[in-house]
Amino acid sequence: TLLILNRQFYRNTDTVSVLDVGQGQCITAFAGDATVMIDCGNTYNLSDAGDLAAAYLHSCGRDRIDLLVLTHLHEDHADGVPRLMEMYDIETLILPEERGDTLYEEILDSAARHATEVITAKGDMTVTCGDIGMELYAYLNGGENERCLMSRLSIGSYDVLVTADAPEKLEKRFVNEHDTDGIETLIVGHHGSKYSSGDELLGAVDGSLAVISVGYNNYGQPAQETLERLAAYGYNVLRTDEDGTIEIRIGQDNG
């Protein structure tokens, strides 16, 4: 009975969650009846991120995904999408174009089979999904990790910044081009890589919580210097490899 009550309470609570998908990323946002997901990738070969994401949504009483945004087409951010589409209706998918990429083509084929609307990001976009707002910042040129969609997700007055795998060079562009006031939570870029979450970004974003989506890896992530930078700027750091799935429940005042 307590579990049912907790689920009912959970279902009616605006929430941003960073799922424990190992060395990958999958973020969900619930507000009212709206369900948004950013990325769905990895867990290595132990399981599929799509299975894990579907199970999580089901446990929260969510029966559809209104919007799925893919920051880029690396497997650790997107390889769970085909499986997820087999289990959940996804109304709209927004992603950057990566013609010739095998996973990109597989996702488009799956979207066509399941009647998911596909929007290819050609530039910055503003998206509203019920009580969830999103600003998508399209960086579509440059090196491999420089081609991505960064996003600012808003529920009421609560804002979270998702920087994908953006390196410091791209973070500097973002800071110079966009307002960073009011961002409370940072989803740390590139699983805590030493090449992301630089001083310019951390100095511009006056947030209090940093979440690192990371699992066992051979890349030294999260890097010690990144953890030290976050601490120096006063961030409380949570990480999925130590804390599991991280749920941020937003108060009734949406802040």
Regions found by a protein language model. Give the residues of each.
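Non-globular, low-confidence helical/coil segments that flank catalytic cores
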Residues: T1-G255
